[in-house]
Amino acid sequence: MNTIHHLSQYALQELKDSYSEHEIECICKIVYMDVLHYTNIDIHLRKNEILEESFINKFIGIVRLLKSGSPIQYILGETGFAGLRFKSTPSALIPRPETEELVRWVGEWLKPGNRLLDVGSGSGCIGISLARLCQGAHVTGVDISPEAIELARENAILNGVKAEFLLRDILHPQTASWDTYDLIVSNPPYIRESEKGTMEAKVLDHEPHQALFVPDEDPLLFYRAIAEFGLTHLHPQGLLFFEINEAFGQETIAL
């Protein structure tokens, strides 16, 4: 077991009870690209080359962690999002591909000189991606987690963008001073506590619950708070952008 071909077969065998074949292939590709710095072409052309023992041992260790439920992004400590690289730790949600759609949507409206607020910024992936997309914009991210704020600040430096990240609680905005914004964007907690049973263990066991869940009796808690905040801190022609729970699409619009 000393080539890419052999290691991929090993991963397929070890992880088949937890992941689909396609997911395992994608995970293997991520490891080869992140650790060996191979391209897609390298992976194909060099699949039968003898690998260094240090990488083989590292790969086996990664598979064991994956088998225990740890997400690959936390294992490697980084992930890709919107063409950028982000440090990824259990202090913030793992950036999801579907959130890139939100970034693209907001990016169509964001202009140089605009002030943008990212509520519940987590790793900073939304705000940082938008700051990179429109470098003349003034981007601020807020979160209630000190660890997430520190992670977002590190990611801003990593990606060479100017964005500030502040410890703030949108449910109690009166406890801090705020600017007035042209755009407010948020991917807030929106999964009801009762929906936990439908979620994968690797999400429930490893990602921060305060960034995922809302009470069953108040699923629009954060959307309502942000909408009310916008009444006093959004310019008259300002815009709100959200990632939402599809089960409450119409109710969210009604706010």
Spans of features found by a protein language model:
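Class I S-adenosylmethionine-dependent transferase superfamily signal
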Residues: 106, 130, 203, 226, ...
